[in-house]
């Protein structure tokens, strides 16, 4: 790889970049290339190495190599040590814990030095591995898109550069690099794919790595279009309130849009089977589905609700007369003197006698609540809400002015 064939770093001039430097060929080549473009692009560079405290003396040697490299390249160097074995979360694998702690450390350093981006040395071979792993897990369109060149505070400029080109660059420049021997054994699924799976694919399908990287780029392009369509659908159909979230008329959405909406609201970790069940629920007239320990979906005619669990309803609050009374997450009710005129045109404003409000509270509904709507006899509030076609999930989110089990005003619905 000669100077003319260096990757095109598509960044604005004057950026401050933090290079994630492991000491391996990929990140060493990245640091060297950025150092060559530093003046041309008016870059402010720094490098960070995270020692995971896993490989003992080898880890310390990696850190020392990175420090010496940065001295030669005139790049400020930051070292942070994390104890991966001691910091693993319950059920977390060593590789996952190392990645989590590494990114946390890099972000701490980025914040401390005021860098615009953390620059990562993921290359074409890494992208091919990532896409294949996602496909084998059945992760869908987002997984097929692999890694994005830019995401949040991360920048990956080498995704179209093969690993062999980076190693050739270093060989041409006479620059050594460190080798993590754990990467040379098939001790993890990714290692097995790198050492055996991809070489076998390349043997049968020459150019497989490049093809997978191109596929990922195409999928990311498609995904951006689909995410914009999801944004437009949610802008028109999504409501949020104390009850949770509501999608109006979900059955009008194309299934591809609907699946992405569900992933957006339920989290990307929702299983494929659950995704299919939720899609079917959206097409049905009524039904409920427990999505997880903290989320339930409920379908009513014309809407689907995503309700947090457990449902925590606020305690009744004594009504301030006059004054304002707040019900946590439900809003504020203002009581003030008013002339005896009708305000029936506004369901959120009503005139009540002061003596009727004595001892009243602001609360949500309870079993046995009763109300006497204007022009009607005494009725169960639940029957009134059913007649008014108030969806069941909304009923628990309805603020009520009440004395005992007597409802004086179901806010937005009717007055007693």
Model segments located where?
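Inter-helical turn/loop segments and adjacent helix faces that build the functional surface
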Residues: 202-212
């Amino acid at each position: 790889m000669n100077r003319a064939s260096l990757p095109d770093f598509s960044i604005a001039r004057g950026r401050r970049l933090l290079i994630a430097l492991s000491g391996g060929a990929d990140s060493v080549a990245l640091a060297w290339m950025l150092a060559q473009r530093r003046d041309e692009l008016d870059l402010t560079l720094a490098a960070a190495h995270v020692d995971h405290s896993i490989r003992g003396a080898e880890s310390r040697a990696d850190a020392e190599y990175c420090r010496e490299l940065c001295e030669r390249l005139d790049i400020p160097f930051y070292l942070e040590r994390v104890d991966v074995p001691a910091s693993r979360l319950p059920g977390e694998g060593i590789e996952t814990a190392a990645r989590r702690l590494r990114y946390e450390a890099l972000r701490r350093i980025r914040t401390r030095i005021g860098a615009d981006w953390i620059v990562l040395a993921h290359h074409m071979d890494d992208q091919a591995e990532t896409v294949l792993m996602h496909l084998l897990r059945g992760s869908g369109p987002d997984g097929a898109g692999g890694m994005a060149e830019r995401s949040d505070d991360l920048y990956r400029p080498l995704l179209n550069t093969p690993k062999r080109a980076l190693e050739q660059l270093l060989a041409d420049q006479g620059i050594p690099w460190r080798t993590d021997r754990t990467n040379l054994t098939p001790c993890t699924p990714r290692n097995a794919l790198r050492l055996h799976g991809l070489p076998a694919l390349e043997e049968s399908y020459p150019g497989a790595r490049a093809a997978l990287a191109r596929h990922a780029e195409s999928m990311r392009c498609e995904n951006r279009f689909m995410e914009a369509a999801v944004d437009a659908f949610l802008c028109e159909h999504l409501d949020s309130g104390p009850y949770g979230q509501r999608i109006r008329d979900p059955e009008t959405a194309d299934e591809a849009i609907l699946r992405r909406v569900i992933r957006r609201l339920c989290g990307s970790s929702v299983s494929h089977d659950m995704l299919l069940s939720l899609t079917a629920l959206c097409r049905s007239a009524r039904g409920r589905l427990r999505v997880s320990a903290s989320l339930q979906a409920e379908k009513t005619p014309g809407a689907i609700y995503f309700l947090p669990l457990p449902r925590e309803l606020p305690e009744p609050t004594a009504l301030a007369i006059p004054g304002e009374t707040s019900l946590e997450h439900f809003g504020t009710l203002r009581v003030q003197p008013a002339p005896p005129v009708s305000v029936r045109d506004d369901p959120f404003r009503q005139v009540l006698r002061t003596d009727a409000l004595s001892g009243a509270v602001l609360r949500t509904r309870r079993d046995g609540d009763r109300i006497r709507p204007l022009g009607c006899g005494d009725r169960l509030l639940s029957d009134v809400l059913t007649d008014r076609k108030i969806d069941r999930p909304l009923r628990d989110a309805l603020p009520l002015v009440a004395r005992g089990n007597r409802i004086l005003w179901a806010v937005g619905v009717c007055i007693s």
